Amino acid sequence: MIIGVGIDIVEIERFVSWTHNVRLLRRFFHQEEIVDFFKNHMRAQFLATRFAAKEAFGKALGTGLRNMELRNIRVCQNGWGKPRLEVYGAAQAMLAATGGTHIQVSLTHEREVASAIVIIEGEPL
């Protein structure tokens, strides 16, 4: 059963300055996302899509992102490149509180914008 759906869109240009700010990276992104970031040649786009996914996750929860650290929401990929979300700490606790057991995520981007949609599935409590 679908518990929640969230979508977010961001301007990629907003993240250009973030590509040179390690402090911001550590604040908003999981350590493994930062490792992947440094391997990626389209860095602002990389950050924008992941940030949009984190925002979309908060919207899908129905609570927003208050009381959780964005770095505890990790965007990663399976072996075929399909994105997936892993959540830790307060983000994981909030997911469990909704009855959520599965998270679906899709990312997309164009020249100027990046977007993400998140669907939380499970059994409502």
UniProtKB/Swiss-Prot annotation:
- Which chemical reaction does it catalyze? apo-[ACP] + CoA = holo-[ACP] + adenosine 3',5'-bisphosphate + H(+)
* Residues spanning the signal sequence: none
Enzyme class, one word?
Answer: transferase
Primary localization class, coarse: cytoplasm
Q: Where does Mg(2+) bind?
A: D8, E55
Q: Which UniProt keywords apply?
A: Cytoplasm, Fatty acid biosynthesis, Fatty acid metabolism, Lipid biosynthesis, Lipid metabolism, Magnesium, Metal-binding, Transferase
Q: Which cofactor does it need?
A: Mg(2+)
Residue ranges annotated as coiled coil are: none
Could you state one GO biological process linked to this protein? Answer: fatty acid biosynthetic process
Q: Which GO terms describe its molecular function?
A: holo-[acyl-carrier-protein] synthase activity; magnesium ion binding
Q: What is its EC number?
A: 2.7.8.7
The GO cellular component terms are: cytoplasm
Location in the cell reads: Cytoplasm
The reply to whether Cytoplasm figures as a keyword in the UniProt entry is: yes
Alphabetical list of Pfam families matching this protein? ACPS (PF01648)
Q: Which InterPro entries match?
A: 4-PPantetheinyl_Trfase_dom, 4-PPantetheinyl_Trfase_dom_sf, ACPS, Ppantetheine-prot_Trfase_dom
Q: What is this protein for, i.e. what is its function?
A: Transfers the 4'-phosphopantetheine moiety from coenzyme A to a Ser of acyl-carrier-protein.
Q: Which family is it part of?
A: Belongs to the P-Pant transferase superfamily. AcpS family.
State what protein this is by name.
Holo-[acyl-carrier-protein] synthase
State which gene encodes it.
acpS
